[in-house]
């Protein structure tokens, strides 16, 4: 006799019974993301988690039932930017009864103080608490609270991407690790993201395989310091394992600390064509004296040794960097050394900012405490930044102009903002506006493009 129990059938509705009510429409969540690629990835994970609980992503805050502000605390005025955005969403809360939550690094930094300062924020949570977001949303319907505790590394669970949400996209972020164990004098990340925790390599590889199965062709492995990855293998080994995933054509990663750049990683750039010829290697300053105060654990000569080994291993590699100008005690000679390094390295791009003291950092504590820690006047720092940016614009323009007439491979990501154009990137991560329609250049396709125009920060071309 079969063990199967037949399913009972619901009786047919009698004549005149009311029709069943339609399913309630999904609630909507709007996410305002500030800052880095880690935050972009975290925002996607939050939307995916809520999607399993009947939430859909809203196109604007005006139609949202839940507004999430995922914040960044790396630069100055982070708190002011958050408060300005919160002010704009206050009316939506009053009109729709929407919940408002603040996550990310400012949330981790401010904790309960943010709830006291902004009475219409319903809850605050730090990066370690993302996996609990659905239950926090329900809890917020009855109370205001802050969840900013750290999880032990053994307990931490990396939110896994929903591959189906990436269907139709050419690229995706994959989290390899979180946190940072370095204590750079200017950086708040160890205070807002916690200690380093590496994701086990089988999980990283499995997520890349799932993404490849729905059409993703490029993955970017992300973490605050991926060079120190330790999820059961080295970072160089992890790159090789991801490169073996069928369907993944391109691999990128960010961010790296020069001190942790290994010879094995350089060899991956030499040997593995799927690892793209682009490396973001933040230097911060061209002065050894400033680097020592920054606690960067390398000299300019050591940085350039790693830089030159990358260039030798992968000729034509595009190397980008970060600079901080006006760090406490920076002299004219220190700044000129940064300019000289920029000219020598000819970075593809540099993300450069005036120093701003961040809470709890060594630089904030020691600012003004000794002659070598004296603040640089704001007007002096701004003038230095303008000179550095001008030099970088010139160098970037020269690099892009050298691409004119060349045929390059472009991975198409989707439509451009301009009608009749598609948007994509070269292996070196240069943005290309391609004159073509979707049929000729669908998302995920790698197409040959002849470069016909070089702008200040991007290229344009036609199918070759």
Swiss-Prot record:
<feature type="domain" description="Radical SAM core">
    <location>
        <begin position="166"/>
        <end position="398"/>
    </location>
</feature>
<dbReference type="InterPro" id="IPR023404">
    <property type="entry name" value="rSAM_horseshoe"/>
</dbReference>
<dbReference type="Pfam" id="PF01938">
    <property type="entry name" value="TRAM"/>
</dbReference>
<keyword id="KW-0808">Transferase</keyword>
<dbReference type="Pfam" id="PF00919">
    <property type="entry name" value="UPF0004"/>
</dbReference>
<keyword id="KW-0479">Metal-binding</keyword>
<dbReference type="InterPro" id="IPR038135">
    <property type="entry name" value="Methylthiotransferase_N_sf"/>
</dbReference>
<keyword id="KW-0819">tRNA processing</keyword>
<comment type="similarity">
    <text>Belongs to the methylthiotransferase family. MiaB subfamily.</text>
</comment>
<dbReference type="GO" id="GO:0046872">
    <property type="term" value="F:metal ion binding"/>
</dbReference>
<dbReference type="Pfam" id="PF04055">
    <property type="entry name" value="Radical_SAM"/>
</dbReference>
<dbReference type="GO" id="GO:0035597">
    <property type="term" value="F:N6-isopentenyladenosine methylthiotransferase activity"/>
</dbReference>
<dbReference type="InterPro" id="IPR002792">
    <property type="entry name" value="TRAM_dom"/>
</dbReference>
<feature type="binding site">
    <location>
        <position position="72"/>
    </location>
    <ligand>
        <name>[4Fe-4S] cluster 1</name>
    </ligand>
</feature>
<dbReference type="InterPro" id="IPR013848">
    <property type="entry name" value="Methylthiotransferase_N"/>
</dbReference>
<dbReference type="GO" id="GO:0051539">
    <property type="term" value="F:4 iron, 4 sulfur cluster binding"/>
</dbReference>
<dbReference type="GO" id="GO:0005829">
    <property type="term" value="C:cytosol"/>
</dbReference>
<feature type="binding site">
    <location>
        <position position="187"/>
    </location>
    <ligand>
        <name>[4Fe-4S] cluster 2</name>
    </ligand>
</feature>
<protein>
    <recommendedName>
        <fullName>tRNA-2-methylthio-N(6)-dimethylallyladenosine synthase</fullName>
        <ecNumber>2.8.4.3</ecNumber>
    </recommendedName>
</protein>
<keyword id="KW-0411">Iron-sulfur</keyword>
<dbReference type="InterPro" id="IPR005839">
    <property type="entry name" value="Methylthiotransferase"/>
</dbReference>
<feature type="binding site">
    <location>
        <position position="184"/>
    </location>
    <ligand>
        <name>[4Fe-4S] cluster 2</name>
    </ligand>
</feature>
<dbReference type="InterPro" id="IPR006638">
    <property type="entry name" value="Elp3/MiaA/NifB-like_rSAM"/>
</dbReference>
<feature type="binding site">
    <location>
        <position position="180"/>
    </location>
    <ligand>
        <name>[4Fe-4S] cluster 2</name>
    </ligand>
</feature>
<feature type="binding site">
    <location>
        <position position="105"/>
    </location>
    <ligand>
        <name>[4Fe-4S] cluster 1</name>
    </ligand>
</feature>
<dbReference type="InterPro" id="IPR006463">
    <property type="entry name" value="MiaB_methiolase"/>
</dbReference>
<keyword id="KW-0949">S-adenosyl-L-methionine</keyword>
<feature type="region of interest" description="Disordered">
    <location>
        <begin position="1"/>
        <end position="25"/>
    </location>
</feature>
<comment type="function">
    <text>Catalyzes the methylthiolation of N6-(dimethylallyl)adenosine (i(6)A), leading to the formation of 2-methylthio-N6-(dimethylallyl)adenosine (ms(2)i(6)A) at position 37 in tRNAs that read codons beginning with uridine.</text>
</comment>
<keyword id="KW-0963">Cytoplasm</keyword>
<comment type="subunit">
    <text>Monomer.</text>
</comment>
<dbReference type="InterPro" id="IPR007197">
    <property type="entry name" value="rSAM"/>
</dbReference>
<keyword id="KW-0004">4Fe-4S</keyword>
<feature type="domain" description="MTTase N-terminal">
    <location>
        <begin position="27"/>
        <end position="142"/>
    </location>
</feature>
<keyword id="KW-0408">Iron</keyword>
<feature type="domain" description="TRAM">
    <location>
        <begin position="401"/>
        <end position="464"/>
    </location>
</feature>
<feature type="binding site">
    <location>
        <position position="36"/>
    </location>
    <ligand>
        <name>[4Fe-4S] cluster 1</name>
    </ligand>
</feature>
């Amino acid at each position: 006799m079969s063990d199967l129990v037949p399913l009972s059938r619901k009786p047919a509705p009698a004549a005149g019974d009311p029709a069943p009510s339609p399913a309630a429409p999904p609630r909507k969540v709007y996410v305002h993301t500030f800052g880095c690629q880690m935050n972009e990835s975290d925002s996607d994970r939050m939307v995916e988690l809520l999607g399993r609980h009947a939430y859909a992503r809203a196109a604007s805050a005006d139609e949202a039932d839940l507004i999430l502000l995922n914040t960044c605390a790396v630069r100055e005025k982070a708190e002011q930017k958050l408060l300005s955005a919160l002010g704009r969403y206050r009316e939506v809360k009053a009109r729709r009864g929407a919940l408002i939550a603040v996550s990310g690094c400012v949330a981790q930094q401010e904790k309960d103080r943010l709830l006291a300062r902004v009475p219409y924020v319903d809850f605050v949570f730090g990066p370690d608490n993302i996996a609990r977001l659905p239950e926090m949303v329900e809890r917020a319907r009855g109370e205001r609270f802050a969840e900013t505790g750290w999880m032990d590394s053994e307990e931490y669970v990396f939110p896994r991407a929903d591959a189906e949400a990436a269907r139709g996209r050419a690229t995706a972020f994959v989290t390899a690790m979180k946190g940072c164990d370095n204590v750079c004098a200017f950086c708040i990340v160890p205070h807002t993201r916690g200690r380093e925790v590496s994701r086990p390599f089988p999980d990283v590889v499995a997520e890349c395989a799932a993404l490849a199965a729905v059409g993703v062709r490029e993955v970017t492995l992300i973490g605050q310091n991926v060079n120190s990855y330790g999820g059961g293998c080295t970072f160089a080994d992890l790159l090789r394992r991801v490169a073996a995933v069928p369907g993944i054509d391109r691999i990128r990663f960010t961010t790296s600390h020069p001190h942790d750049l290994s010879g094995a990683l350089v060899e991956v750039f030499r040997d593995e064509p799927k690892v793209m010829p682009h490396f973001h290697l933040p230097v911060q300053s061209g002065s050894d004296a400033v680097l020592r105060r920054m606690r960067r654990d390398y000299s300019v000569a050591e940085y350039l040794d790693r830089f030159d080994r990358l260039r030798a291993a992968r000729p034509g590699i595009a190397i980008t960097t970060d600079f901080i100008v006006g760090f406490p005690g920076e002299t004219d000679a220190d700044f000129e050394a940064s300019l000289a390094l920029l000219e020598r390295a000819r970075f593809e791009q540099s993300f450069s900012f005036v120093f701003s003291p961040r809470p709890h950092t060594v630089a904030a504590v020691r600012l003004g405490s000794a002659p070598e820690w004296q603040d640089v006047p704001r007007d002096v720092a701004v003038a230095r930044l303008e000179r550095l940016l001008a030099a970088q614009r010139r160098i970037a323009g020269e690099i892009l102009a050298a691409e004119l007439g060349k045929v390059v491979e472009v991975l198409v990501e989707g439509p451009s903002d301009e009608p009749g154009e598609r948007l994509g990137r070269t292996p070196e991560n240069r943005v290309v506006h391609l004159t073509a329609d979707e049929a000729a250049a669908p998302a995920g396709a790698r197409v040959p493009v002849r470069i016909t125009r070089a702008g200040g920060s991007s290229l344009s071309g036609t199918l070759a």
